[in-house]
Structures are given as structure tokens and as C-alpha cells.
């Protein structure tokens, strides 16, 4: 048995390879992007499901640190200065503390408000990423892969404990405000 190889000009050979395989690679990329987006969607749904079934009625562990302050508020001894005090000696978290008290006042301290704010911040973050991607000169499959990557990082199952831990709402808010600020700066005409 013998084989006969036909010599071709390198440019013709490369053109034929490119033409023959570009459809296959686009198909593989589209399939990969679709599967990645589906995985991101399923993991997001599972994470949201876990967040809702693991939430329990009653203050979460980090809200117990605020019981003394809540009691002072009910006795009329509390002031807004508390919201500006450093938490744990490290940083001031005015808005999360305010959210804790609003959650306690309106929802009985079950963390429903802080969880909702954290999830809304993540959704808004993803929305800004999607807007940025629409403005870029990328292929649709590349946009899908990038958006799915952000979705996985924003809503992965490792985020569930962060959604439940009310203190972490500060990180979601600061990340969203930071991205929104950079987006606004990038959109300015000057």
C-alpha cells in the first residue's frame, strides 16, 4: 500500500484549511458560549434558591452585635452618631448600619432587606457589565462568555454565605458604586 501526497502551494493550502475550519471553530465557540451561559444561569438559580431556603427568621449572627444599640434606640438614648462610628475599629459603614436598623424596624431583623439590597446590587453590577459589553466591538459569543463569567462570579454558590451575612452588603454596595462611577466617567464626553 502506498500513499501519494499532492504538493500544493502553501497559500492555497492555508486558505483551504482556514475556509474549511472556520465554520467548525465558530460552531464550537457558539456551543461553548451557550453551554457556559446555561451553566451560569443554572448556578445562579441554584444560588438564589439556596439563599432563600437558608435565610431564617430572626437576626442573623452579625445583627446580634447591634442589639445593644437597638435597645438604646428604643429607650430614646441612641443617636445618629452611632452610624458614623468605626465598626470593629476599622471602617465606617453608615449605609449598612442604617440598613440593619431599617431591616429590624420593618422586617423584624430577619435580614430580608440586606439580602434584597445585596442581590439588587449584584443585578445592577451585571446590568452595567452588559451595557459596557454592548458598546464594545466584540463578537456575540465573546460577549456571552464574558457576561456568563461575570454572572458566575456575582452569583456563584460561594456567594450564598455573603448574601446571608448582612455585614457583607457593604461590599456589594461599594463594588456597585465604584463600577457605576467608572462607567459614568467613561461615558463623559471629555
Feature map (PLM): residue ranges:
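Start-transfer (signal-anchor) and selected internal transmembrane alpha helices
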Residues: 1-47
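Helix-to-loop transition at the C-terminal end of transmembrane segments
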Residues: 45-66, 160-162
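Juxtamembrane "helix-exit" motif on the non-cytosolic side of transmembrane helices
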Residues: 53-54, 103, 133-134, 155-165
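Membrane-proximal lumenal/periplasmic loop motifs of glycosylation machinery
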Residues: 54-59, 72-98, 105, 111-116
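Membrane-embedded glycan-lipid processing machinery
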Residues: 57, 88, 113-117, 159-173
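Transmembrane-helix motifs of polytopic, lipid-linked glycan transferases
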Residues: 116-140, 180-184
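Membrane-interface transmembrane helices that cradle and orient dolichyl/undecaprenyl
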Residues: 173, 178-190
Amino acid at each position: 500500500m502506498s500513499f501519494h501526497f499532492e504538493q500544493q502551494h502553501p497559500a492555497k493550502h492555508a486558505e483551504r484549511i482556514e475556509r474549511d475550519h472556520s465554520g467548525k471553530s465558530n460552531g464550537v465557540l457558539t456551543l461553548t458560549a451557550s453551554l457556559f451561559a446555561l451553566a451560569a444561569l443554572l448556578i445562579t438559580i441554584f444560588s438564589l434558591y439556596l439563599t432563600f431556603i437558608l435565610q431564617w427568621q430572626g437576626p442573623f449572627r452579625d445583627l446580634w452585635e447591634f442589639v445593644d444599640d437597638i435597645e438604646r434606640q428604643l429607650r430614646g438614648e441612641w443617636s445618629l452618631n452611632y452610624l458614623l462610628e468605626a465598626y470593629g475599629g476599622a471602617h465606617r459603614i453608615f449605609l449598612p448600619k442604617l440598613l440593619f436598623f431599617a431591616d429590624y424596624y420593618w422586617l423584624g431583623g430577619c435580614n430580608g432587606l440586606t439580602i434584597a439590597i445585596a442581590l439588587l446590587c449584584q443585578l445592577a453590577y451585571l446590568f452595567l457589565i452588559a451595557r459596557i459589553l454592548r458598546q464594545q466591538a466584540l463578537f456575540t459569543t465573546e460577549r456571552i462568555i464574558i457576561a456568563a463569567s461575570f454572572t458566575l462570579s456575582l452569583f456563584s454558590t460561594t456567594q450564598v454565605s455573603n448574601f446571608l451575612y448582612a455585614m457583607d452588603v457593604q461590599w456589594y454596595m461599594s463594588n456597585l458604586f465604584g463600577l457605576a462611577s467608572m462607567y459614568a466617567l467613561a461615558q463623559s464626553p471629555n
